[in-house]
């Protein structure tokens, strides 16, 4: 028939459709803008679960292991995708043990926290120290371990001192309700606390944080994963504002604005020391 499309016309139509879809995909990826607890998938859409946080995840609490689309949001897991430094090359055995060896003998954490457990956890959060410049990446690693050092006493403590006697249950939080007999005191490298942190952290990592919070003090990889989960959701995005912004994100209500200058100074000194070890300037806005 005279009005039937020819093979050549069909080919041009198919090519045009492919280009349109490609452009749409790129535009949505560039403007993902997900909430902090959601992942930006390799196709540029927000959500949770392996379809969004797995292979090719661009930003957010990515599972890692991907190697898909790099760029501004985080790139692939492990050694592929994204910019920044290799975390493994910065966090050497000498650096990690240099912190831990300052803890007194007999500390529970000395036989719990290991460099390998940290690296295993870091592979699940591909945006950590991987989506910015080399110097920015080193500063982020220095900041993370400065807070870990302060929170755990050079990796001495796994559990918060006298934590079991504290009440970290927000009964008004209906999404992550406290479970009978369970305590949500500080555990792990960043001493994650409160039911509203244990619940979503466990959901993201793959354990029941509300019913089994002690898991954070029993499995060193899960322990580091909870720290990195908290970091990526609460601290990573303010890192470029300076180390002081990270203090405010972690414990600002109790330390900033002159409330505990000794704690602030300790965190800053650890950070400056680790930046020196990494050969990078610590930048400005160090205090809060």
From Swiss-Prot:
Protein name: Chitinase 5
All copies of domain Chitin-binding type-1, residue ranges: 30-64
Keyword terms: Carbohydrate metabolism, Chitin degradation, Chitin-binding, Disulfide bond, Glycosidase, Hydrolase, Plant defense, Polysaccharide degradation, Signal
Disulfide bond annotation, renumbered to this chain: 32-40, 34-46, 39-53, 57-62, 107-156, 169-178, 256-288
Organism listed in the record: Oryza sativa subsp. japonica (Rice)
Gene Ontology annotations of biological process type: cell wall macromolecule catabolic process; chitin catabolic process; defense response; polysaccharide catabolic process
Pfam family, one: Chitin_bind_1
GO molecular function terms listed in the Swiss-Prot or TrEMBL record: chitin binding; chitinase activity; endochitinase activity
Family label: Belongs to the glycosyl hydrolase 19 family. Chitinase class IV subfamily.
Function noted in UniProt: May function in reproductive organs during embryogenesis and seed maturation.
Keyword hit for Disulfide bond: yes
């Amino acid at each position: 028939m005279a009005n039937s499309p020819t093979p050549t016309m069909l080919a041009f139509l198919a090519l045009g459709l492919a280009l349109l879809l490609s452009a749409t995909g790129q535009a949505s990826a560039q403007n993902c803008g997900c909430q902090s607890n959601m992942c930006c998938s390799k196709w540029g859409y927000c959500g949770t679960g392996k379809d969004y946080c797995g292979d090719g995840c661009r930003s957010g609490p990515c599972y890692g292991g991907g190697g898909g689309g790099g760029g501004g949001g985080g790139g692939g897991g492990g050694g592929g995708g994204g910019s920044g430094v290799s975390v493994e090359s910065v966090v050497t055995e000498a650096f990690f043990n240099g912190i831990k060896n300052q803890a007194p003998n007999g500390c529970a954490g000395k036989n719990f926290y290991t460099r390998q457990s940290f690296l295993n956890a870091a592979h699940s959060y591909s945006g950590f120290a991987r989506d910015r410049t080399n110097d920015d990446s080193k500063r982020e690693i220095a900041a993370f371990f400065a807070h870990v050092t302060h929170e755990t006493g050079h990796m001495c403590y796994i559990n918060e001192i006298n934590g079991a006697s504290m009440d970290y249950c927000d009964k008004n939080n209906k999404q992550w309700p406290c479970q009978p007999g369970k305590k949500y005191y500080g555990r792990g490298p960043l001493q994650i606390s409160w039911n509203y942190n244990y619940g979503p952290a466990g959901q993201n990592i793959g354990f029941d944080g509300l019913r089994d919070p002690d898991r954070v003090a029993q499995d060193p990889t899960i322990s580091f994963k909870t720290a990195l989960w908290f970091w990526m959701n609460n601290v990573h995005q303010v890192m470029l504002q300076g180390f002081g912004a990270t203090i405010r994100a972690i414990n600002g209500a109790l330390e900033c604005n002159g409330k505990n200058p000794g704690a602030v100074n300790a965190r800053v000194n650890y950070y400056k020391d680790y930046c020196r070890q990494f050969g990078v300037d610590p930048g400005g806005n160090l205090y809060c």
